[in-house]
Each structure stands twice: as structure tokens, then as C-alpha cells.
Amino acid sequence: MERRVFGKSLVGGAVAAGIAAGLSTEQAVPQAARTLKPKKNLEMHVGGDYHSIAGGPGADMTAKSNLEYNLRHGVKHLTAQVRKLGPDGAWDADELKRMKDNCDKAGMNFEAIRMDADYIMLRPGSERDRRLEAIIGNIQKASQVGVKVVTHHWTVIPIRRNARQDGRGGVTYAAFKLEENWKDLPVGTAGKVSSDDYWERITTFLHAVIPVCKQYDVRMAAHPYDPPGLPFGYQGAENWDSPSIFEGYKKYEAIVDSPYNGFQLCLGTTAEGLRNPATEVIPIVQYLAGRGKVHQIHMRNIKGGLNNFAEVYPDEGEMDFLKIMRILRDSPFNMSICPDHMPTHSEDPGRLQAYAFGYGYIKALIHAVNSEV
């Protein structure tokens, strides 16, 4: 508790002042905030999710085959999507109970649910109001089956990739390079969304939803838009994590400063918005994890950085995940660390092999950092 108060009063103010003074993100985070006392963290764990499903995309995530696939690779915590939806995106309570029962029978913890991004597409009006009411109801239903986290990825334009690169062992890496003619790209289906419009939607969402999350003990975890740092106006959007991913995180969590308002901290996405991911990602993780605002980790590595990158295996990119895992170990973080966006291969079309590697890599990192203390 004392650490969180310290983070709010001193770290937040110092970081804001440092950034305003033109310091780098690393310079702006006080040394005290970068020196958490080493301690074992036996609560953080590897997690499985919707990126890799035995049976293929769209298959039942709580079917015996998928649960056993995860359990075989040491995964005991699941983030699932709800396929059966009612009006305005309402989750079916019976479907949630079925998923929970399947997980319980298999020895799997039904830890989190990824909700859709439909809300963020909507302008103020009755349709958006109905969607918010459905989300509030979904939080209550999630609580009833013991789910602790609801994740979401606000995408007024789709995730952007426009290139492929060859990788080790014949795999293919998804990649992105900012187009020279990006101003000529078509506007997304949501139409033009200004920064003010975007933040109005986020603010309305957080003020309506976070008090309900607190009431039902369900944490809301926002995934940064992928990729961050796109120039304003890219496909008509002025994304919340542009032009600065770090500033976006701080602004987002400050709207409703609550332990229930946090992030699905995608390390790969965060790195995509940085010129020097190896060094610049560290103070971001320190800041968010030290404040208890990380409710899930996506552990993905990249080669490159801002506006020019490729998604690679976790052991070959710009970031040193051992350093990041030490920060998580010493912080209040106690949720899932999930592999994310693994490379593809013709002999592994569902990427089950690739994600199995990711699960083992994460488990080894957790063991390694806890063995140090």
C-alpha cells in the first residue's frame, strides 16, 4: 500500500515534470522508483489466450482439446473470448457458466475475458449508451464466475501490418513500415476520430465502468493500440497512444486513478512506439508495474522500433525480457504473462508449436528471476 501511495504522489509528479522538461522517459523516472526491493513473486504466472487455440481460430477455448493443450505446456490460467453474445454485445450467463465448469473440471483457472472493441467505434448516442449498459452487465457476469480481469483493445482502425520478413527456420515475421503515402490511405470504418473524440469516448467509458469494476472486484485492462505512435490522421484516426505511448499510458490511467483501471501491457506494442525499445521500455514497465496498474502482460519482442518493425521470437528482439521480468517480480504484479503474435510457418498453421515455445520461455524466465532471490 505504501508503494502505491509513493507512486501516486512522487513518481507521477516527477515523471510529468521530467517529461515536460524534455527529459527522456528513463531520465524522467526517479531513481527510487527504479529500485524496488528484490523479492520472490510466486503469484505471477504464464497464461494462455485466444492467440493460440487447439482446433483453430473460432474453436471453443474451453473444449477438452484446448484446455489439455495449455495444461501440457504448463499453462493453468486462461484468457478467453465469449462467442455467444446477446443484444449490444451482452455475454450469455449460461455460456460463461459452461466455460467456467469446463475450466474447473480440467484444473484450469478461468482468469480473464477479452471483450470486443465495438464500444470505441461509437459516437455519443443511444447505441453507445446501450453498449455501455451491456458492458456493465458483463462485468457483473464475469464476477459471478470468478473472472478477475477483463481486457480490451480499442481499435478505431484495425491493427496495422503491411509487410512480411523471413525469419529463422523458415518462419515468417509480420512487419510494418510507415508508408510514404500514408495520408492517401482510406479512412477506417469508424470515420474520422479526432484525439478529443477518442479521449471523450475513453473518459465516458472509464467513469461508467471502473466504479462497477471496483464493486465486483474485476480489473479492467486496456491494450495499447497496435502500433502506437502513428501520425495523427492515419486512416482518419488520432489514436490515444500517439504521438507518445508513455504519455498515453499516464493520461489513460489518470482519468480514473484506481487499481481497477489498468493495462494489458503489451510489451511488443509498447516497443513499436519507441525509438530505442531496449532502454525506453524499462521505465514504462517500472512506472506502471510499480503503481499496480499492470493486470496482464503480452510478452512479444520486435526488431526495430517506431514506425518500422518486425514481430519476432521473444529471445531475438530488441528487449531484454530478463530485465523486465525482474521488474515484474519486485512489483505488485500477480497475473498472467502471455506469449503474443508468434511467427508463422507452413508446418505450424495454428502456431501451436510457436506458442508452446513461448509458454516454456516465460516459465523459464519466472523460474530464473525467482531463483535470484
Indicate residue ranges for each PLM-predicted region.
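Histidine-acidic metal/acid-base catalytic patches
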Residues: 2-43, 122, 146-148, 203-207, ...
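Boundary/entry segment of secreted carbohydrate-active catalytic domains
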Residues: 34-62
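A generic structural signal for short
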Residues: 47-49, 54-55, 87-88, 126-127, ...
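Active-site-proximal loop/turn and secondary-structure-junction residues that shape catalytic pockets
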Residues: 50-54, 84, 116-119, 154-158, ...
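Short, acidic/polar
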Residues: 54-70, 132-139, 280-287
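Long, His/Glu/Asp-enriched segments that create or flank divalent metal/ion-associated functional microenvironments
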Residues: 78
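Structural motif corresponding to the early beta-alpha repeats
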Residues: 81-203, 207, 214-215, 269, ...
